[in-house]
Amino acid sequence: GMVMAEAMGVDTSRSRMVIFVIAAMHAAAAGWLYAHLQRFVNPSPFGVHVGIEYLFMAVVGGAGQVWGAIAGAGVITILKQWLQDWLPKVFGASGNFETIIFGLMMVVILQRARDGLWPLLAKLVPARGTTRVIDASAEPLLRKAMPAAGEVILEAKNVTRRFGGLVANNDMNLHVEAGEILALIGPNGAGKSTMFNQLSGVDTPTSGEVLFRGKSIAGHGSREIAHLGMSRSFQHVRLLPKMSVLENVAIGAHLRGTKSVLPSAWRLDRVEEARILREAAFQIERVGLGEFMHAEAGSLALGQQRILEIARALASDPCLLLLDEPAAGLRLKEKQALGELMKKLRGEGMAILLVEHDMDFVMGLVDRVVVMEFGQKIAEGLPDEVQKNPRVLEAYLGGVE
């Protein structure tokens, strides 16, 4: 999830550091209270075995849930005490029987509830206000003006990428203009995804230059590039499957907020949260996933997850959208709806760079096509021109008679 979060403008290193500090503050406060309660402090209650037991409480309760650690602590503490009191009476002798029985019970619990007890209990109890409420009266997030039609948004100049002795991209040149859909196509192994990653900041060119609105971004991280106005989807879907569709899309709008991790952790950002959730809901409706807004992202079909990634990318309000095989796994009607959405975005002035294998989808949609083979550009032009190019036909069909 870190690659995805960085691509959406999240400073993952800083966020993890702040969360670690907050957790340390809570631990320090707990230690202070413990010392005053016991009137005496010694190292034994803070040994490795006790630390593992505390960690086990979180795992059993549900480490991904707010109330999971509390549930796990309650269950393990009560269960251990009950076994210590009950087993000697059953066996008629004292001993560490509870350790064996407790271990077996924990194995069963973790087999039956791999995500912890709290999610299992939540499924058994009717939901009461568990879904996030969309405040229609929340003030919309500010939107940036789109560039003028025809302005060069992204340009790659002589981009080369080497992995040891392998040249994945060799002297690649391309550009994308505002209000245009450009397709980057080629056979498997042509180097499209490598090029895509260099343009979006996930990877760095060995040589050459990448310009975004006239500014060099080669070597810049994907987080910095996202703040400039570029957003993307991924070839292999990158979602947070246990979070709702709404929450996943809200990640895309993160960079449009002003609050830091600390106010968010202590729930001091309610107004901004309402604005971000409203934006996320708008983008979900925009791509046709409104009925799944509060469903877990992992429960959606693969094609719907790809559409969800597009909604998340749009939530960041980009002027350039990079889509990596967005039509893969979609049915015909879903492809048609995606095509209409992309045409609408183009009409609004957005630039779109598309990597796709579905030639029927591409040729009826895009304005220009760049074709790659073995890491090099072999053709560029209008869709009709490219389809008749002998080098393109040879790359795809092995030559023509």
Show the residue positions of the predicted features.
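Short loop-to-helix capping motifs
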Residues: G1-M2, G64-V66, N389
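Hydrophobic/aromatic residues within transmembrane alpha-helices
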Residues: M4-A5, V75, L117
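Glycine/proline-centered hinge or cleavage motifs at structural transition points of membrane proteins
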Residues: A5, G9-V10, G68
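Transmembrane alpha-helical segments in multi-pass inner-membrane proteins
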Residues: R16-M105
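Short helix-terminus and kink motifs of transmembrane alpha helices
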Residues: Q81-Q84, D115-P119
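ABC-family P-loop ATPase nucleotide-binding domain
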Residues: W118-T160, V400-E401
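Glycine-rich phosphate-binding loops of nucleotide-dependent enzymes
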Residues: A149-A156, T160-E401
